[in-house]
């Protein structure tokens, strides 16, 4: 119904199984975010990031996958995008930074650098 009225859908999930079940509903964006890591400054391990993206893409390659939880700086953003995520989340990483505006800028630059690196001609 959301598509019919022009609304985008974003759904958060914790586990690979949850993400796979939700992917069958075809949201526009899935947020892969292990609950136990939210606000800890500890990012998901590489296996979780790659497995969640792979699992969602096998069901519906049109769903964007955002990785959340523990993203605290530009390097975390860069690394996560390089693993295949289309985006990252970062609430605590920004709001707990000494200079939140500078952290947003750092993260945006890291996103751009990773995007450019992944899409080199």
Question: PLM ranges: what are they?
Answer:
Residues 3, 23, 57, 78-81, ...:
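A structural alpha-helix within SAM-dependent methyltransferase catalytic domains
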Residues 19, 49-54, 77-78, 101-108:
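Generic structural signal for well-ordered alpha-helices
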Residues 30-42, 83-104:
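Glycine-rich phosphate-binding active-site loops on the catalytic face of alpha/beta enzymes
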């Amino acid at each position: 119904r959301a598509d019919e009225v022009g609304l985008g859908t974003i759904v958060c999930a914790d586990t690979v199984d949850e993400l796979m079940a939700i992917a069958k509903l075809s949201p526009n964006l899935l947020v892969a975010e292990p609950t136990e890591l939210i606000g800890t400054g500890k990012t998901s391990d590489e296996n979780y990031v790659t497995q969640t993206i792979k699992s969602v893409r096998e069901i519906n390659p049109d769903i964007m996958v955002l990785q959340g939880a523990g993203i605290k700086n530009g390097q975390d953003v860069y690394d996560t995008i390089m693993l295949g995520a289309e985006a990252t989340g970062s609430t605590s990483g920004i709001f707990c930074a000494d200079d939140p505006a500078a952290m947003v800028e750092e993260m945006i630059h890291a996103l751009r650098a990773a995007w450019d690196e992944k899409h080199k001609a």
